[in-house]
UniProtKB/Swiss-Prot annotation:
One of its GO terms (cellular component) is core mediator complex. Component of the Mediator complex, a coactivator involved in the regulated transcription of nearly all RNA polymerase II-dependent genes. Mediator functions as a bridge to convey information from gene-specific regulatory proteins to the basal RNA polymerase II transcription machinery. Mediator is recruited to promoters by direct interactions with regulatory proteins and serves as a scaffold for the assembly of a functional preinitiation complex with RNA polymerase II and the general transcription factors. It comes from Mus musculus (Mouse). Signal peptide: none annotated. This is Mediator of RNA polymerase II transcription subunit 16. InterPro entries: MED16_bridge, Mediator_Med16, Mediator_Med16_C, Mediator_Med16_N, Quinoprot_gluc/sorb_DH_b-prop, WD40/YVTN_repeat-like_dom_sf, WD40_repeat_dom_sf, WD40_rpt. Keywords: Activator, Nucleus, Repeat, Transcription, Transcription regulation, WD repeat. One of its GO terms (biological process) is transcription by RNA polymerase II. Pfam families: Med16_bridge (PF20718), Med16_C (PF20719), Med16_N (PF11635), WD40 (PF00400). It comes from the Eukaryota. GO terms for molecular function: nuclear thyroid hormone receptor binding; transcription coactivator activity. Component of the Mediator complex, which is composed of MED1, MED4, MED6, MED7, MED8, MED9, MED10, MED11, MED12, MED13, MED13L, MED14, MED15, MED16, MED17, MED18, MED19, MED20, MED21, MED22, MED23, MED24, MED25, MED26, MED27, MED29, MED30, MED31, CCNC, CDK8 and CDC2L6/CDK11. The MED12, MED13, CCNC and CDK8 subunits form a distinct module termed the CDK8 module. Mediator containing the CDK8 module is less active than Mediator lacking this module in supporting transcriptional activation.
Length: 828
């Protein structure tokens, strides 16, 4: 474990902070982190803020004045990572969602309330989606064998089996409240007592069973009292939410039954199920003022012994022993320093003895450890069942040591320690919020302190990348562990595994793997130019599918193939270098579009024409792999797409000449489209068959050498060099950052002076998705991708149906799958 970066507040007067209040923290599958702080202003009023940041740009924190009247006690992300629940000590629950799908713009439109009753536990209802990781099958060829869907029922279903959305919360007075979000937007809320005899609930946690039930664990805070468990069933009867509860077996902590320890740990300070969908295992922590003890318990079915008298009366009873559920302790720690925070892994690894042995044999450790933070400032990763220490992180010297002795607080514990922690979704990173509001990001090695061969470490990272590819989770935390020397191997292995999948699955994952390769290639100076190629291929695939979708069959009773499919088939069959001869074989009536639509598409068509020209001009320099676009010169599939688009553009140009790409030629009589199509076809013929690519002949190379003297080659605006952190982080050299202040980061591998990547200050900007020029200092509000840096305008300047269809693709996410964030006008 080592520190990746630390982010502090610009001005944080100690008199304005309320250290006695609890902090909450949550980490989404999209690598957004939400956390709370509580500040006093000059009037001594409390402002309960929720801070949301993207792990790649932590200084760009978005702070929301939550509107909660009391301290926020819980934060919880949904499965998609796009909505956030917050609950406070007054019983108010709010549901936050992105405004305009921007990661730094949030609004709350719905919520619920149990007035005056503090919320101690909060969770979204389970949607029935659960994946299992099969570590022992990491070498299998099919993703379906490595990651399988587990049969798991949603907490509540709508008509047709669709899971119903909503949340469940437990209050300090022993109430359970459930709110259901109907498709109409209406919220159904119901509240019920956990049991007939209500009692104080100081700590609680929520888990789900495969049968669709909910399990609540509750404790009153005293280690002398039992930890109680309840089964909660939610249903909708006559358009009203109904809650049924049932008492389950309870337990007493082991330390309370030991005469030597009975009074040493008077309070239960932490109560957690080991996983949201694992209600059979629970973690408990009992503490005194200075020390703690942690126990892990498991719920098991055991046979109930039957007295011989009853066996003689009824032999049937003796044949089939009755079974009961009973809590059994799995492990316990020795006395520890006082535990200040606990973080549990989210990686869905099974914890049966067989699976643990497999994990040990394969040396796959991510997801096996949970994190304990102590008041001495240290963090221990311990095995989630045996509780044995696997890795330790020691923070730097506490701040109080830097102060004069007279000013130091009279306390036995140091000033700085984590009050809230969360593990990432692959368990390779840990975020901690300390008692001064400072955010620390820690790398957690995949080996967790065990010696691992480099080849095996690479295999584990590949396995987790595949997991993110299948689930759609963001993989930023995996990139923290990728060294420049690993990039080439990871990209090649990832491509090999991808090509082994069925064609249908390949099509589903086609954009995700390109985005993954692009983010990997940013980490090495040898592969940084390929980042441009991968993003360009994403853009080309999007343009191709959009333009083909505009084509309509002339008659309704058409054969099975769409006009787009016929276009691809004819272009692949006819290898003629004359664009007009290829065009003759197509039914041109299928390409007829409205004139306004054609004109609105001109910028996209211009990009296609410019890119073809750029590629052909690059052909004589193909020996330079650092030049953007290099990989396209051997990519028969992409060249085939460009060839199809050139044919479509040619046909549309006959309908409306002003929609054609504009070329600046040295001769007025030159047919630029025909010239480029002829050269493009020759290049495509050389590499259209995979594995049998031939070198372009000298005649083609000579003609491409002459292109700059025949046509003016435009400057292509590649994606901007990323301003994110991950490509700039150095091992053992944590970055010191400040919230709200853009840092001066050390040079990254992607800032090398490569052709097409250099940018001078004040250089004109471009809308990367609409291909519109924004000027050197844009006046329109823009948004940028958190992952690749792609910039586009927030509001559309064009209302044409075809353009709207194109822009609808990028409403929620960038073409690489990254989230959007609003950028200031000065940064656009």
């Amino acid at each position: 474990m080592d520190l990746a970066y630390v982010c502090e507040w610009e001005k944080w007067a100690k008199s304005t902070y309320c250290p006695s209040l609890p902090l909450a923290c949550a980490w989404s599958c999209r690598n957004l982190i939400a956390f709370t702080t509580d500040l006093r202003n000059d009037d001594q009023d409390l402002t309960h803020m929720i801070h949301i940041l993207d792990t790649e740009h932590p200084w760009e924190v978005h702070s929301v004045s939550s509107g909660h009247s009391e301290a926020i006690t819980c934060l919880e992300w949904d499965q998609s990572g796009s909505r956030l629940l917050s609950a406070d000590a007054d019983g108010q629950i709010k549901c936050w969602s992105m405004a305009d799908h921007l990661a730094n713009s949030w609004e709350s439109s719905v919520g619920s309330q149990v007035e005056g009753d503090p919320i101690v536990a909060l969770s979204w209802l389970h949607n029935g989606v659960k994946l299992a990781l099969h570590v022992e099958k990491s070498g299998a060829s099919s993703f379906g064998e490595k990651f399988s869907r587990v049969k798991f029922s949603p907490s509540l279903t709508l008509f047709g089996g669709k899971p119903m959305e909503g949340w469940i919360a437990v209050t300090v007075s022993g109430l359970v409240t459930v709110s259901l979000l109907k498709p109409s937007g209406q919220v159904l809320t119901s509240t019920e007592s956990l049991c007939r005899l209500r009692g104080r609930v100081a700590l609680a946690d929520i888990a789900f069973t495969g049968g669709g039930n909910i399990v609540v664990a509750a404790a009153d805070g005293s280690s002398a009292s039992p930890v109680k468990f309840y089964k909660v069933c939610v249903s909708v009867v006559s358009e009203k939410c109904r809650i049924d509860t049932e008492i389950l077996p309870s337990l007493f902590m082991r330390c309370t039954t030991d005469p030597n320890r009975k009074d040493r740990f008077p309070a239960i300070t932490h109560l957690k199920f080991l996983a949201r969908d694992m209600s059979e295992q629970v973690l408990l922590c009992a503490s005194s003022q200075t020390s703690s003890l942690v126990e892990c318990w498991s719920l098991r079915k055991e046979g109930l012994p039957v007295n011989n008298i009853f066996q003689q009366i009824s032999p049937v009873v003796g044949d089939k022993q009755p079974m009961i559920l009973k809590w059994r302790i799995l492990s316990a720690t020795n006395d520890l320093d006082r535990v200040s925070a606990v973080a549990l892994p989210k990686l869905p690894i099974s914890l049966t003895n067989t699976d643990l042995k497999v994990a040990s044999d394969t040396q796959f450790y991510p997801g096996l450890g949970l994190a304990l933070a102590f008041q001495d400032g240290s963090v221990h990763m311990v095995h989630r069942l045996s509780l044995q220490t696997m890795a330790v992180f020691y923070s730097s010297a506490p701040r109080s040591l830097d102060e004069p002795a007279l000013k130091r607080p009279r306390t036995t514990c140091p000033a700085v320690h984590f009050k809230a922690m969360q593990l990432s979704w692959t368990s390779l990173a840990l975020v901690g919020i300390d008692n001064h509001g400072k955010l620390s990001m820690l790398r957690i090695s995949p080996s967790l302190g065990h010696p691992l061969e480099p080849k095996l470490a690479l295999q584990h990272l590949l396995f987790l990348l595949e997991y993110c590819m299948v689930t759609g989770y963001d993989w930023w935390d995996i990139l923290l562990h990728v060294q420049p020397g690993m990039v080439q191997s990871l990209v090649e292995r990832l491509h090999e595994e991808y090509t082994r999948q069925k064609p249908a699955l390949q099509q589903v994952l086609s954009t995700r793997i390109l985005a993954m390769k692009a983010s990997l290639c940013k980490l090495s100076p040898c592969t940084v130019a390929r980042v441009c190629d991968y993003h360009t291929k994403l853009f080309l695939m999007a343009i191709t599918s959009t333009l083909k979708s505009l084509l309509r069959p002339h008659f309704l009773n058409t054969p099975d193939k769409s006009p787009g499919d016929r276009l691809a088939e004819i272009c692949a069959k006819i290898t003629d270098v004359d664009i007009d001869k290829v065009m003759i074989n197509l039914k041109t009536e299928e390409f007829v579009l409205d004139m306004n639509t054609l004109q609105a598409l001109q910028q996209l068509l211009q990009w296609v024409g410019d890119f073809v020209l750029y590629l052909l001009v690059s052909l004589p320099n193909q020996g330079s792999p650092l030049r953007p676009g290099h990989s396209f010169l051997r990519d028969g599939t992409s060249l085939g797409m460009l060839r199809e688009l050139m044919v479509v553009i040619r046909i549309w140009g006959l309908l409306k000449p002003s929609c054609l790409p504009v070329y600046t030629a040295t001769s007025d009589t030159q047919d630029s489209m025909s010239l480029l199509f002829r050269l493009l076809t020759k290049l495509w013929i050389c590499c259209r068959d995979e594995g049998a690519a031939s070198e372009p002949d000298e005649g083609l190379v000579d003609e491409c050498c002459l292109l700059p003297s025949q046509l003016l080659v435009p400057n292509l605006d590649w994606l901007p060099a990323s301003d994110g952190l991950v490509s700039r982080l150095q091992p053992k050299q944590p970055l010191r950052l400040r919230f709200g202040r853009a840092p001066t980061l050390p040079s990254s591998t992607s800032t090398l002076q490569l052709d097409g990547l250099t940018r001078a200050p004040g250089q004109p900007k471009i809308d990367h998705l609409r291909r519109l020029h924004l000027g050197a200092y844009p006046t329109e509000e823009c948004k940028a991708c958190t992952r690749c840096g792609c910039v586009t305008m927030l509001k559309s300047p064009n209302k044409t149906t075809a353009v709207t269809q194109w822009e609808q693709r990028w409403i929620k996410n960038c073409l690489c799958g990254g989230l959007w964030r609003r950028v200031p006008l000065s940064c656009s």
